[in-house]
Each structure stands twice: as structure tokens, then as C-alpha cells.
Curated annotation (Swiss-Prot):
It comes from Metallosphaera sedula (strain ATCC 51363 / DSM 5348 / JCM 9185 / NBRC 15509 / TH2). Residues 59-78 are annotated as: Disordered. HAMAP family: GatC. Allows the formation of correctly charged Asn-tRNA(Asn) or Gln-tRNA(Gln) through the transamidation of misacylated Asp-tRNA(Asn) or Glu-tRNA(Gln) in organisms which lack either or both of asparaginyl-tRNA or glutaminyl-tRNA synthetases. The reaction takes place in the presence of glutamine and ATP through an activated phospho-Asp-tRNA(Asn) or phospho-Glu-tRNA(Gln). InterPro entries: Asp/Glu-ADT_sf_sub_c (IPR036113), GatC (IPR003837). One of its GO terms (biological process) is translation. Pfam families: GatC. The gene is gatC. Residues 63-78 have a biased composition (Basic and acidic residues). Keywords: ATP-binding, Ligase, Nucleotide-binding, Protein biosynthesis. One of its GO terms (molecular function) is asparaginyl-tRNA synthase (glutamine-hydrolyzing) activity. This is Aspartyl/glutamyl-tRNA(Asn/Gln) amidotransferase subunit C. It catalyses: L-glutamyl-tRNA(Gln) + L-glutamine + ATP + H2O = L-glutaminyl-tRNA(Gln) + L-glutamate + ADP + phosphate + H(+); L-aspartyl-tRNA(Asn) + L-glutamine + ATP + H2O = L-asparaginyl-tRNA(Asn) + L-glutamate + ADP + phosphate + 2 H(+). Its EC number is 6.3.5.-.
Length: 97
């Protein structure tokens, strides 16, 4: 199914994404979106008859068993931390100041 990327579609997408684009940005996004959708159309053209569906990329992968191990000591954990105080990591402020 070919989707026509036009001004109307772009304005709908802008509204849904709660963004406002300039005319130049809209034209750039239209070109980019057209390329992306063309790639998906190429995938649709593939003959996948006889190919088993893959539900998860790791379904046949080999994972190591989840076994408890010795954790890092506090000193080792804080060794490369740029800011710390009283044995705790100091991170950036996320509220206000």
C-alpha cells in the first residue's frame, strides 16, 4: 500500500505531534518520510513464502544463566564517579535548581 506524503498529511502529523514546522522543514520532512515509506514498500515486495515468522530476535540465542555474583564494593562502585558525597553519587538536579 503506497501512502501519499503531501502537505495535508504533514499538517495532520504536525497536529498529532504537537509541533509546528516551517515550510522548509515541512518539505524536508516530506522528502525524508517519503524515503522511509519507500523502504517499507520494498520490504512488502519480498517473497517470504516458506519463511518461518520470527517472534523475537533472541528466541534462538544463547543467553548465559542468570546467577548471582559478588557485587561491587562501595569503594569500587564510586571509584570513577565524578561527584560523590558521604558514599553517595551526586547527580544533576532534576527539579528547579
Amino acid at each position: 500500500m503506497k501512502v501519499q506524503v503531501d502537505e495535508e498529511l504533514m499538517r495532520k502529523l504536525e497536529k498529532l505531534a504537537l509541533i509546528s514546522l516551517t515550510d522548509q522543514e515541512r518539505q524536508e520532512f516530506m522528502r525524508d518520510l517519503t524515503k522511509i515509506l519507500d523502504f517499507f514498500n520494498k520490504i512488502d515486495e519480498l517473497n517470504l513464502e516458506g519463511v518461518e515468522p520470527m517472534f523475537h530476535p533472541l528466541s534462538t540465542g544463547k543467553l548465559r544463566p542468570d546467577e548471582p555474583a559478588q557485587p561491587l564494593s562501595r569503594d569500587d562502585a564510586l571509584a570513577n564517579v565524578p561527584k560523590k558525597k558521604d558514599g553517595y553519587i551526586i547527580g544533576p538536579s532534576t527539579i528547579g535548581g
